C-alpha cells in the first residue's frame, strides 16, 4: 500500500465537519442469473494524511482476493475537494484514488480509498475507455462485453488539477435487467483553459445469482449539501455504485461536486448500500438533486 501527495501548503485549523441525514428509495432491476452469488466480499480502506496538501493519491491493496471495485470518501473537504480518480485494477488487486482541491482551500482534509475485495468471480474483466485530450466537457459510455454484467465503475481525470468535476455517472440499465455499463460526464469548473482527458472504467463478470440495481434520490432544492443511500435488498451487497448530481439549470451543472461515493453498511451487517454525497462547489441559487445507484450482488 502506498500514499503520494503533491503541492504542500501550510496547514490552517480544520473546519467543522458537517453531519447529514441520508434516505433511500428508487427503482430496481433484476435478472435470472447463470452462476452462484458472489461470496467473500469485504472492504479494505486506507486513508491519506490529514493536512492541506492540494492533491492526494492513495493506493490500497486487497490482502486476499482482488479488487472488484471500490469508492472514496473525503473528510472535511467542505465542497472544495473533489474525487478526481477511482481506478480499480483487477490484475494487481488494487484501488487507486486521487482527490484534489478545487479552489485555494486552507483547511486540513483527507481522502480514504475503499477497495471492495473478493475472490475473482467467473469471467472477471476490467474495461477502460479514454477520451481525446482537449478542453471541452466530456460524456462517455462504457459497457461490459458480451453478456457480462456490471460489478463496479471507476474514472480518472488527466491534467484536470481540480478544475474538472465528474458529477454525473448513470448506470446503463433497464428495469428488469442488471446494469451492464455506465454513462459518465465530466465538466470544467471556472472556465479551465487547459486540455485534459477522461478515462472511464467498468469491472464486469459473468451474471451472478440475484444481481440487481437500486437507486435513491434526494429532493430537488437549493440546499448546498446533499447525501443519499441506495440500499440493496436483504442478503445482497453493494459491490459498486454511481453518483449523479443534476442541476435544473444546465448552466450551473459544472458547480456540483461529488464529495464521496462508497459502499457501506446500513443498520449493521453486510456492505448493503451505496452512499453518495455532493456539494455546490460554488454557491448557486438553482434547485438540484442527487441520485445514488447501488450495484447489488
Which positions does each model-derived feature cover?
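Extracellular attachment/recognition segments
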Residues: 37-297
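N-terminal export and membrane-targeting signals
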Residues: 2-19
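C-terminal region of N-terminal signal peptides and the immediate post-cleavage residues
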Residues: 24-41
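Residue-level detector of functional hotspots within protein domains
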Residues: 13, 22, 103
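Hydrophobic alpha-helical elements and their junctions with loops/disorder across both membrane
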Residues: 20-26, 77
